[in-house]
Amino acid sequence: MGKIIGIDLGTTNSCVAIMDGTKARVLENSEGDRTTPSIIAYTQDGETLVGQPAKRQAVTNPQNTLFAIKRLIGRRFQDEEAQRDKDIMPYKIIAADNGDAWLEVKGQKIAPPQISAEVLKKMKKTAEDYLGEPVTEAVITVPAYFNDAQRQATKDAGRIAGLEVKRIINEPTAAALAYGLDKEVGNRTIAVYDLGGGTFDISIIEIDEVDGEKTFEVLATNGDTHLGGEDFDSRLINYLVEEFKKDQGMDLRTDPLAMQRLKEAAEKAKIELSSAQQTDVNLPYITADGSGPKHMNIKVTRAKLESLVEDLVNRSIEPLKVALQDAGLSVSDIQDVILVGGQTRMPMVQKKVADFFGKEPRKDVNPDEAVAIGAAVQGGVLSGEVKDVLLLDVTPLSLGIETMGGVMTPLITKNTTIPTKHSQVFSTAEDNQSAVTIHVLQGERKRAQDNKSLGQFNLDGIQPAPRGMAQIEVTFDIDADGILHVSAKDKNTGREQKITIKASSGLNEEEIQKMVRDAEANAEADRKFEELVQTRNQADHLIHGTRKQLEEAGDKLPAEDKTAIEDAVKALEAALKSEDKAEIEAKTQALVQVSGKLLEMAQQQAAAGGDAGDTSAKKEDDVVDAEFEEVKDKK
């Protein structure tokens, strides 16, 4: 059985880890970094860039550089959050035919899971390069407060990337696994405060240890799927735009290029202000008007940044209170507080959390890597590599159906341990009713329309009977991924209807299969491109070496040989301008053949030089030959 890798698919950055024996190891990507920016760019010449290369070219290609896509995954276009992003993002957010929030790039409609799949493919490739074998299975993390549609969309992204998603687990739970696995923690109750690039979660988790077996039980979870570092950046960007407008009378919001430069500078300034009291946002030639170029140079203090984002930090405190209340605990019952997510490096966030819990958060958990490590641990549990670990997670939101009068009737309440199954008997609302519509909802509001609609289906063929007499048994079954399966059964006739909830939006099977095929086709195109580049590089190398040898040979080489070699070099240079790999290879081979005489001369010269060297280099008696042993890196 191959490795089940652990992937933290983040809003801002993503990370991949594997189990290496009993320890989880975070893997470095092809750029040598342990985290990869969750950024995808589509270039003018049709290339798809992922991670750091995409981030580097964002300034010159803002409309086709996609970031923070996790905030849109599994969302409807009309959702308040999607509408908010539509107004501030440099790329185009559109409504898909089914009402989902999609993106438009270079005239093409793309679903968020397709874009996230590009990041997952890079994570998959990173693991394959390290392991030296194909990877087909993964555990992927999601914010604890993700609803069913968002979880399903994340699973779809995994499939499009060529991964079988063995489990979807919640990010705070993964962080708790990373914290608790290698520490002798005994029995503890911990709070995981996870403020990432786009989402916020709080989970209260109990770790019990009995005879060496550790049980991680989530007691309660809460959060906000549209609160994170991106919002902090936006506040600083807006402030800088307004200051520049006051100073220069120009609104940078109309200039996508300037806004992309400003976004990068704001993120950098925010990070610097975690360790410094003030910083300068210095952007020469940010824009220009009739009078010439304009420069931005604005001083930002830590106090200023804190005043801009204080309400965002405060917004994270209310869910802490609710989570503690749901767990039936008080602040004094929490033994350890763990901070996860890059935004928790901000001193103000750390102080607010410390003030709330009355204790300093732990600093021995890496906020960028803990979630991926936990996902790898869960992968190890599923593959049997990790023993003596039991994980009991919960569903973050109540699940129910719409009943008479537009009321939401919960069947499974929030913070119920999963997997779980619950049935309830309902009846008809009218005489001789022959069909019922089961409308499945997720949320905490009493009025059905105020909750998230997960989908609906009909149960027909009900025997005619007076109102209230028919017995319809509705069963909700949540699997370990937190994904819902619903069935409705007429107890009188035994007639049954079942569905796995796919949000009334979401991708259908046909769309997913098409995206999987497209991804495979792209992988083939990428492989061919890589081979072409290698062939070109070899040809370049040969041209350079041949020219050098021609110079060194001088008049010793017969004129006809020299002409033949120069003609072959020119032919190869012409072939290099094409995209034809076979043509480049043929011309490379032709050059190798005609330059045989040149190679012969070079070898003779080298041999002559070597003989001369031997006569002069007598071995000293007091020099000892060093013994060495080649040590190969263990991969």
Curated annotation (Swiss-Prot):
> Which keywords accompany this UniProt record?
ATP-binding, Chaperone, Nucleotide-binding, Phosphoprotein, Stress response
Induction is noted as: By stress conditions e.g. heat shock.
Task: Answer yes or no on keyword Coiled coil.
Answer: no
- Any Pfam family the entry gives: HSP70
So which domain of life are we looking at?
Bacteria
Which residues are recorded with the post-translational modification Phosphothreonine?
199
Region Disordered: which residues?
A: 602-635
> Cross-referenced InterPro entries, in alphabetical order?
ATPase_NBD (IPR043129), Chaperone_DnaK (IPR012725), Heat_shock_70_CS (IPR018181), HSP70_C_sf (IPR029048), HSP70_peptide-bd_sf (IPR029047), Hsp_70_fam (IPR013126)
Q: Name one GO molecular function term.
A: ATP-dependent protein folding chaperone
Query: Which family is this protein grouped under?
Result: Belongs to the heat shock protein 70 family.
Q: Which HAMAP family match?
A: DnaK
Relate the protein's function as given in its record.
Acts as a chaperone.
Q: What is this protein called?
A: Chaperone protein DnaK
Source organism: Yersinia enterocolitica serotype O:8 / biotype 1B (strain NCTC 13174 / 8081)
